[in-house]
């Protein structure tokens, strides 16, 4: 759960294909039309989901951003326009030298593997949100008190979608 506040989100793009330094290659870029901002959201695995922290990446007035994508040159291209303002196409590229450290917490392999297993369990439970099954019923009951909120939620929804007479 990440609260950036009020705004008018218009688009997102992942930095995986960028030529930006490491923390930004793993970031999710979120465009806000109303406040003229592009946020970089840095995600870290947290159980069956992710946690995020954000920073302002590009800001301006007016900068009513409407869309974004990374080009084959690794630069971020974004467009602006709307409500009688001048439309535009902009390019953001990295020209410096990458830093040694990303500034993000280093996660151990054990933590990453545990988070991966949690996400796989959540996905297994989510199958039973639309499919009735004895296996799904047992899996849901087994995980109703799981430590992870998202797994508990998936288990509850899976249980709610199974016939009550099988409970």
Predicted regions and their residues:
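Well-ordered alpha-helical segments embedded in enzymatic catalytic cores
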Residues: 8-11, 139, 154
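Residue-level signal for short amphipathic helical patches enriched in basic/charged
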Residues: 84, 146-147, 162
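Beta-propeller domains with acidic blade repeats across secreted/periplasmic ectodomains
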Residues: 1-127
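Amphipathic alpha-helical scaffolding segments comprising HEAT/armadillo-like alpha-solenoid repeats
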Residues: 102-107, 132-142, 162-167
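Structural detector for internal amphipathic alpha-helices that build alpha-solenoid repeat scaffolds
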Residues: 115-132, 142, 150-161
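Detector for the c-type heme attachment site
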Residues: 94, 144-145
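Soluble non-cytosolic domains of exported or imported proteins
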Residues: 3, 146-149
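Non-catalytic alpha-helical coupling and interface elements of nucleotide-dependent molecular machines
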Residues: 94-97, 160, 164
């Amino acid at each position: 759960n990440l609260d950036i506040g009020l705004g008018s989100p218009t688009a997102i793009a992942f930095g995986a294909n960028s030529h930006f330094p490491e923390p930004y290659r793993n970031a999710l870029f979120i465009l806000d039309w109303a406040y003229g901002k592009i946020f970089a959201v840095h995600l870290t695995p947290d159980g069956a989901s992710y946690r995020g922290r954000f920073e302002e990446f590009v800001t301006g007035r007016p900068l009513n951003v409407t869309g974004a994508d990374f080009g084959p040159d690794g630069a971020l291209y974004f467009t602006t326009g709307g409500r009688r303002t001048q439309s535009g196409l902009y390019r953001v590229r990295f020209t410096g030298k990458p830093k040694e450290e990303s500034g993000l917490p280093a996660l151990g392999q054990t933590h990453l593997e545990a988070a991966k297993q949690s996400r796989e369990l959540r996905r297994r439970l989510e199958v039973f949100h639309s499919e009735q099954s004895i296996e799904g019923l047992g899996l849901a009951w087994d995980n109703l008190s799981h430590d992870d909120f998202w797994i508990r939620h998936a288990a509850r929804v899976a249980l709610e979608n199974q016939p009550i007479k099988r409970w």
